[in-house]
Every structure is written in C-alpha cells, then in structure tokens.
C-alpha cells in the first residue's frame, strides 16, 4: 500500500497498515471518480493543452459522453469564460449521466484526503442506460440498431448528437432482422430495426434516462 495514500511520508517495508473488513469485504483503493469539468478555465490557464479521457473498462457510452462534454466545455471556455460558466449546469448534468462513483478532483489541488475515497460501498450511480449504436437504415427508414440493453415500444430515448446537443425520440416500432415485430428488445448485441419516426444518423449513440 502506498504510504502517501494513508497519511505517511515514506514507505517502510516492515511497517504494517491496518485493513478493516465487513461482511461484504474491504474497500481498498475504492476511489471516487476524477471530475474536473468545473475547472476547465484553470486547466487552460495553467498551460495544459491535452487531456486524456480514461476509457479502459468503460462502455462506448461513457467515453462518448465524457469526451463530448469535455470537448464542448473546452471550446466554450476558449470562446469566453463567461460562456463556459453559463453552461456549467449542462456539463455537470451530462457527466452525471455516466455511471460513476461520486466525484473528486484527485491530486489536481494537492494531496488527497479521506474524502476522496469511498469506505462503505462499491455501488455505482447510474442515471442513464446505454441503449445502442446506429449501424444503418433499411428501405422503410427504420434505424438498424446494435442493441446494448433492453428497451420497449413506447419508451422515450435520448439521441446523443456530436455537437453536444441531445434529442428525445419515441420508439414507435421494433422489428428483428427478418422484419418480425417485437414489443421489446431484450437480447444484448441483437441487431434490430427501430422506427423512431425520423432519421437518426449512423454512428449516433442512444441512451435512456432512468427515473429516480
């Protein structure tokens, strides 16, 4: 265990650190997720001109949501700090649509303390579900969708548009690849055709907001 993470200045090989366990196990290195969306102006002022979005073990929805939001925040801030600050609620709402474990600023403003870790749970917060990615269209104008999670006819789905905007559409009909109607799409990675009543471009990601 790194001593800097538990309050000591240097590591000593024969020094033991107490580890506590409950009926669900331990929560060693159970860090909150890094979130610097509220400090883009300070990052740019510091001369940083490249940010890395961590994508390992993440879904395409997570990477698309985070990368798109930071890209828009950076562009807005470079246009004017006032515009960036005025859109802060939008950035924070978008980041919160990812699956996450509370937020921290990590080591950006100095050493972390006990508030950067989670000690009583390993539960993720989930506000949106990844529905699928548009792969094409058929002759009827239905969207060919690689489905990721179950959804049903009549549900409202949110389309992520690369410019940072979102659009809500309603599932009017679902068909399998052979044209047979379906009331819901329960099988992950199934290729299906969906009628949203309007065109959705290939490559766009779809998600559903979860009620709280």
Task: Identify the residue ranges that each predicted region occupies.
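Generic recognition of flexible, low-complexity loop/linker segments
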Residues: 39-40, 58, 120-121, 132-133, ...
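Long hydrophobic segments that form regular secondary structure
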Residues: 24-70
């Amino acid at each position: 265990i790194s001593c800097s993470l538990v309050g000591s200045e240097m590591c000593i090989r024969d020094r033991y650190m107490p580890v506590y366990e409950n009926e669900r196990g331990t929560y060693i290195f159970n860090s909150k997720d890094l979130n610097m969306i509220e400090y883009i102006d300070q990052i740019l002022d510091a001369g940083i001109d490249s940010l890395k979005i961590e994508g390992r073990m993440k879904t395409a929805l997570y990477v698309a949501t985070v990368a798109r939001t930071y890209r828009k925040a950076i562009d807005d801030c470079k246009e004017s700090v006032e515009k960036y600050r005025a859109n802060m609620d939008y950035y924070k709402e978008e980041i919160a649509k990812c699956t996450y474990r509370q937020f921290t600023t990590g080591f950006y403003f100095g050493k972390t303390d006990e508030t950067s870790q989670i000690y009583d749970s390993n539960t993720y917060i989930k506000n949106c579900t990844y529905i699928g990615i548009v792969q094409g269209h058929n002759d009827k104008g239905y969207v060919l969708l690689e489905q990721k999670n179950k959804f049903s006819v009549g549900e409202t789905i949110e389309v992520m548009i690369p410019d940072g905007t979102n659009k809500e559409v309603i599932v009017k009909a679902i068909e399998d690849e052979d044209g047979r109607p379906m009331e819901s799409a329960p099988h992950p990675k199934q290729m299906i055709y969906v009628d949203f009543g309007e065109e959705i471009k290939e490559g766009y990601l779809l998600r559903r907001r979860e009620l709280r």
